[in-house]
Structure formats: C-alpha cells, structure tokens
C-alpha cells in the first residue's frame, strides 16, 4: 500500500506539472539579479553630470529609475535589471556572460514604471507610465575570459515642450489634458530616435486660481528636429470638456521649447509666435526656444 500511495503521489505531481502553463511576461518583470559576474556596468555620469551628484538631488530633479539590458547581436534579450532610487546597488549592475559579443543598453528616467525592453530597436514607454527626461547608453561590447567593468556615460535623447499657463485656472476646470502627435513614445536604442508614430497623452489635475502653472511634455523625435501637433483640453470634475486649443510646436532633440501664454483668455483666437531665440546653452540642455501662444 505504501508503494501504491507513493506511486499515485508521483503521478499526481507529474499531471499537475504537465497542466501548468509557463508564464511569459512582456512587461519586463523578468529580472536578472546577479551579485557576481564577469561584466559590471557602472554609471559614471548622466548628460555630463557626475552620477553621485545627480543622485543627491531631490527626487523631482534626479532620475529615479535605471534599466540595464544585455542582448545578443541578433537583438534577443538575455539579461535585464531594473533599479530604483534608494536601492543599495543603484547605478551598478553585474552580469555573468559567456565569451562573445553583446549589446549593452542602459536607461535613466523618472517614469512611473519600467519601459518594455524586449527589443532594443523598440524600447517603449506608454501613456499610463508617463514620459519623462530619458538618458541612454548603447554599445556593443566583447566579453572575454577576464572580468571587466564598464563606466557608462548616458546622454539625453528626449525633447521637451515646457507649457506655461500665465493666467489663473478658472473656476470649474479640474483637469488639463495634453495630447500631442509628431513624436514617439518609443525609441530605437541604436540611434536614440523615435521609432513609431505615437499619440502621447499627459493629464494633470488642477485647481481654480492656480497661477503660472507649468507642464512638461517629453517626446522622442524621429530625427534631430521635428514638430508636434499639440492639443490642450480642459475638463470639469465630471469629465465634461469645457474647451480645447490646438497649436504647432517646433522641437529639437536635447532642447527645450517653452510655450508661454494666457490659456483661458481669448481662447478663440489663433495662436501666434511672438519671437524665437536659442539661449542658455549649458551642460543640461543644448538650448532653449521661447514662444508665446
């Protein structure tokens, strides 16, 4: 009887194992956590700012998420690690790899989630995660018999439309929605350029009498310059649309385009550009453009 019971137990385990379906995740939760390895990646600077200095800034200024991925030369992902500001190993990732040539991708950003990194030629953020300043490292490396440490310098691949509302938020307006086309929410890591035609959406809760409010709209351009079609929509607390305004915005990679104006006064008028200038070239952004709407 003991033999029969043991046999039945083994058969039951085999049946359960055979019925269980493997879980295949495309949300990039399958991480590689290795304390020791032959390839160590350490972020040294982000857009010319030393990484230790960057992480000492407030959460609103610093990139609070890092992603490290290793691909073979055909683009198949082999390793993946996500890190958040405050993690003990924030800024350093270690992998154990056989000898060979690999593609290394590292990202720094402050999105509400991790991008999909299945394919290095289409790294994708989405509207629910939000779009933030994003920095990239991409390189092919050769792993041999000796362990090595790479010092990574990440560069900015985003463009920023900074939308400033000078007048006060009127009574009844509870939400502002910014919908923009012409850029991309995904990018090709080998180029740093956008790779799809996206409709990006950013939503902000607002309150009456708020003044000089600022809204940052990030995108990945398809080349070094481009333009966005931007639509701003105001809603009440019940989700009813109160009004909307549309405009075109010239954009350049690694530059800020400022849009300033009175959004809620004379909303039927056609927006015009008062002037444009490239100013304040610095180590953070290559330039800034100023317009009024």
Predicted features by range, described:
Residues 33-34, 151-158, 221-223:
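Conserved "repeat-terminator" motif of extracellular CCP/Sushi domains
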Residues 22, 84-89, 111-149, 238-267:
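Structured interaction patches on ligand/partner-binding surfaces of diverse proteins
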